[in-house]
Swiss-Prot record:
Native source species: Histophilus somni (strain 129Pt) (Haemophilus somnus)
Biological role: Nucleotide-binding protein.
Short name of one Pfam family: DUF520
Lineage: Bacteria, Pseudomonadati, Pseudomonadota, Gammaproteobacteria, Pasteurellales
Claim: Magnesium is one of the keywords in the record: no
UniProt-listed InterPro entries: DUF520, UPF0234-like_C, UPF0234_N, YajQ-like_sf
Entry's Gene Ontology molecular function annotations: nucleotide binding
Entry keyword Transmembrane helix: no
Gene3D superfamilies according to UniProt: 3.30.70.860, YajQ-like, domain 2 (3.30.70.990)
Name of the featured protein: Nucleotide-binding protein HS_0688
SUPFAM superfamilies found in the cross-reference section: YajQ-like
Keywords: Nucleotide-binding
Amino acid sequence: MPSFDIVSEITLYEIRNAVENANRVLSTRYDFRGVEATIELNEKAETIKVTTESDFQLEQLIEILISACVKRDIQHNSLDIPADSEHSGKLYSKEIKLKQGIETDMAKKIIKLIKDAKLKVQTQIQGEQVRVSGKSRDDLQATIQLVKNAELGQPFQFNNFRD
């Protein structure tokens, strides 16, 4: 019986490259001359810390980071950007988390979406991924298109396709 897995993964070396590119752009921006501003990647905690002197500049820095991520084919909704910023002394900062894996609530939404479409496939949650199996490849391809076109707020990849 054919099957595949729905996963949500970000390659850390692409994130590292995006952060380095964003820092390079930051060093050439005129509006950030003489301003203490940093974009730092913590690979172990899978977070990006963005720090600068004002709230407005913080939003500008996040836009620079998002554009660098998009250039590296990392979708911006794979970054979990908090709404409010932390303020300590003269610096504002935000701790941006990277969305790795599919949480249980999101997996349940995916399964509900597939069941509501009445496709002839079986779904099951396996840790941080969703396994989809069915009798025909056409049903599996329809499932892939359904999940791709759904606005679930997280990018998904499809791997481990077996016949």
